[in-house]
């Protein structure tokens, strides 16, 4: 499947408390990173107090290394300062140091850092995608995508993923490189991120064909990274969006894993910062309530549907799911040119992020409230959606009377796009 799985610690279910700071324990089988942690500070901490805490950590860590005379731990690596107030850091600390940190009254909780990786990918070359046609039609089985000519113009989509091939012809110069928190190669050497980006803003495969795409790389060529690196990407996207206009921005996270309070808090900080965030529900065919950041209520959680308007057999479900979107055998861009077919809630999610960008182009305004707008325009068609799960499938509103402003409808037929 195309969903990116984060092997993240299970928080809250089992946590030790040392002087008020929880050290989150991990679920059996989770691939944690040895001696690496994420530390989240108390709500409302000032920048001055945060800097003072960080200075204390660095001083204490250095003293411990000198006394130990052992192989050096790396110490503090990433620092998080979300514009909405969430603060924290990650680093490489021994058990004694992390216990010292946990005793601090200004620490809210600590999680073990964990590996992030992608699942197996289904691939088939050079076939047309049905997903776009479904987004623009009230009925299944169509071959034409109906959309307003604004096509997301003026919006920006932050794709937090494996990177994007920004030179791909699908993006017509509208894709740019944003930041890299995993390696020194500003390229998508995996393919997942380019596929996701193409579904959002590609000229052929995109829901919002005139939107801008910003690549935020948090996973390497093998589709692997760390939870701490993903949170850095989330922070960077939030800050950049606020500088350029959060009400014109959307973010896509086609990744997730076991429940993580740090991951959920970072996702909530994006939404609080005024950015619409679409997140994959997951590919384990289980209730997404135990997944992160899918279980964060302030974001838009997306399950995957099939061409027959049924729940994809791999898709997670549950009350936390906001909408369904096409996610089975979706065609989009691949690095180096051309296209490929992938399946997963990873593929469903950019349809929703793209629809958010599309609605921004129509003047509906941005922010987390876009999820409610998307649910209002959705159609009640999904068969067997799963226990306590919505049956709403996204729709762009073209020709079905949901949107309260005039549309200049364009149409694209797959026979034209693919010379069939």
UniProtKB/Swiss-Prot annotation:
One of its GO terms (biological process) is proteolysis. The keyword Protease applies. Residues 1-20 form the signal peptide. PROSITE patterns: SUBTILASE, SUBTILASE_HIS, SUBTILASE_SER. The keyword Signal applies. Its main location: secreted. Keywords: Glycoprotein, Hydrolase, Protease, Secreted, Serine protease, Signal, Virulence, Zymogen. Residues 21-119 form a propeptide. Induction: Expression is up-regulated during infection. Residues 129-413 form the Peptidase S8 domain. GO terms for cellular component: extracellular region. GO terms for molecular function: serine-type endopeptidase activity. It is found in: Secreted. The active site is at residues 161, 192, 346. Belongs to the peptidase S8 family. Secreted subtilisin-like serine protease with keratinolytic activity that contributes to pathogenicity. This is Subtilisin-like protease 7. It comes from Arthroderma benhamiae (strain ATCC MYA-4681 / CBS 112371).
């Amino acid at each position: 499947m195309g969903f990116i799985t984060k092997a993240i610690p299970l928080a809250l279910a089992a946590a030790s408390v040392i002087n008020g700071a929880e050290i989150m324990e991990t679920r059996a089988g989770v691939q944690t990173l040895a001696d690496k942690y994420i530390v989240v500070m108390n709500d409302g901490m000032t920048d001055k107090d945060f800097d003072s805490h960080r200075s204390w950590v660095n001083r204490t860590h250095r003293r411990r290394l000198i006394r130990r005379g052992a192989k050096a731990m790396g110490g503090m690596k990433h620092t998080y300062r979300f514009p909405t107030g969430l603060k924290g850091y990650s680093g490489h600390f021994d058990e004694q140091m992390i216990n010292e940190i946990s005793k601090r009254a200004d620490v809210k909780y600590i999680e073990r850092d964990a590996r992030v990786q992608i699942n197996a990918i289904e691939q088939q070359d050079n076939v047309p995608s049905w997903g776009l046609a479904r987004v623009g039609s009230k009925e299944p089985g169509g071959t034409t995508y109906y959309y307003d000519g604004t096509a997301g113009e003026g919006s920006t989509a932050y794709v937090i993923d494996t990177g994007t091939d920004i030179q791909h012809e699908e993006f017509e110069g509208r894709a740019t490189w944003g930041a890299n928190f995993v390696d020194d190669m500003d390229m998508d050497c995996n393919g997942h991120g380019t596929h996701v980006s193409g579904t959002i803003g590609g000229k052929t495969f995109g829901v919002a064909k005139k939107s801008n795409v910003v690549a935020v790389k948090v996973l390497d060529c093998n589709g692997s990274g760390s939870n701490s690196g993903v949170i850095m990407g989330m922070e960077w996207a939030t800050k950049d969006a606020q500088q350029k206009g959060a009400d014109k921005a959307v973010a896509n996270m086609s990744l997730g894993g076991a429940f993580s309070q740090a991951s959920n808090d970072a996702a909530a900080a994006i939404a609080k910062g005024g950015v619409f965030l679409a997140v994959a529900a997951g590919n384990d065919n289980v209730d997404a309530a135990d997944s992160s950041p899918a279980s964060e209520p302030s974001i838009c959680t997306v399950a995957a549907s099939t061409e027959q308007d049924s729940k994809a057999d791999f898709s997670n479900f549950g009350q936390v799911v906001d909408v369904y979107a096409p996610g089975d055998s979706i065609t989009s861009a691949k690095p180096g040119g051309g296209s490929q077919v992938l399946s997963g809630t990873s593929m469903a999610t950019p349809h929703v992020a793209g629809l958010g960008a599309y609605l921004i182009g129509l003047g509906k305004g941005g922010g987390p409230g876009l999820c409610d707008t998307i649910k209002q325009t959705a159609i009640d068609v999904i068969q067997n959606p799963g226990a306590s799960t919505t049956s709403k499938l996204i729709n762009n509103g073209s020709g079905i009377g949901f949107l309260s402003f005039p549309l200049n409808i364009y149409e694209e037929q797959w026979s034209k796009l693919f010379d069939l």
